[in-house]
Amino acid sequence: MQKPQYIDRITKKKVIEPIFYEKTMLFLYNSKLGKKLSVFLSTHPIFSRIYGWLQRCSWTRRQIRPFMNRYKISEKELTKPVADFTSFNDFFTRKLKPEARPIVGGKEVFITPVDGRYLVYPNVSEFDKFIVKSKAFSLPKLLGDHELTKLYAHGSIVFARLAPFDYHRFHFPCDCLPQKTRCVNGALFSVHPLAVKDNFILFCENKRTVTVLETEQFGNVLYLEVGAMNVGSIVQTFSPNQTYAKGDEKGFFAFGGSTVILLFLPNAIRFDNDLLKNSRMGFETRCLMGQSLGRSQREEI
């Protein structure tokens, strides 16, 4: 079976994505028994809570150094020495030095809010044209709000998928006034490409949070964090109804893989050309937090 590939934004080369717990993932999503087991585990949150508790135990510290070596995670980016982490989950939710993720300036520039693999689509209503095998993607089901669905039905959408070895804090992508976050309860299906490749509706069924960002340059932007298998915890560290600057921390995911989804009103943003090109070819683009995602179309009117 062909392994997932993405395009690295810096090198512009295709990269074969390493599969976290490869044998387990292949069993869960490429066998009949595995698929049934994955549904059972994902719809019973007790398993995710137990797994999360285990990753908070002090003995998991021994996993950190081998994990960093395997996935080439730089210790120089960390705000504290590896020896100071109290558990694997403590390392998983690590903070980085500001210089490790420089922020692109300009109020008209919307930045990538997380380290992850990005897909961008200028029009939500055309989304199915790009997803060949996927089960139906449902915006009403994703948002759980009829009024928001009407507003964003012809807007733009971004998927940013995080792998377990990525930096797992998420940030504000522009200057904004965030409203109170709303939680939409759901299961915790994996968002690994092996799981999602034929089933984008998983994003509409997983536990997720929705925050409206009031912005001057981009109108109201919807910012969603989607939980995944072994990620029962989406932690918001911001205070609603207070202004935040581009690049400020919004929150973090506890252990596992996860996804951020952004929704824009029609004609609010023009995505960068490389992201558009790669998405149209069916390739995710690996970006680092703080890079340019697109520009406000208000500047062009």
Curated annotation (Swiss-Prot):
Its EC number is 4.1.1.65. GO terms for biological process: phosphatidylethanolamine biosynthetic process. It is found in: Cell membrane. The record marks G257, S258 as: Cleavage (non-hydrolytic). Pathway: Phospholipid metabolism; phosphatidylethanolamine biosynthesis; phosphatidylethanolamine from CDP-diacylglycerol: step 2/2. InterPro entries: PS_Dcarbxylase, PSD-B, PSD_type2_pro. Binds 1 pyruvoyl group covalently per subunit. GO terms for molecular function: phosphatidylserine decarboxylase activity. Is synthesized initially as an inactive proenzyme. Formation of the active enzyme involves a self-maturation process in which the active site pyruvoyl group is generated from an internal serine residue via an autocatalytic post-translational modification. Two non-identical subunits are generated from the proenzyme in this reaction, and the pyruvate is formed at the N-terminus of the alpha chain, which is derived from the carboxyl end of the proenzyme. Catalyzes the formation of phosphatidylethanolamine (PtdEtn) from phosphatidylserine (PtdSer). This is Phosphatidylserine decarboxylase proenzyme. The lineage of its organism: Bacteria, Pseudomonadati, Chlamydiota, Chlamydiia, Chlamydiales.
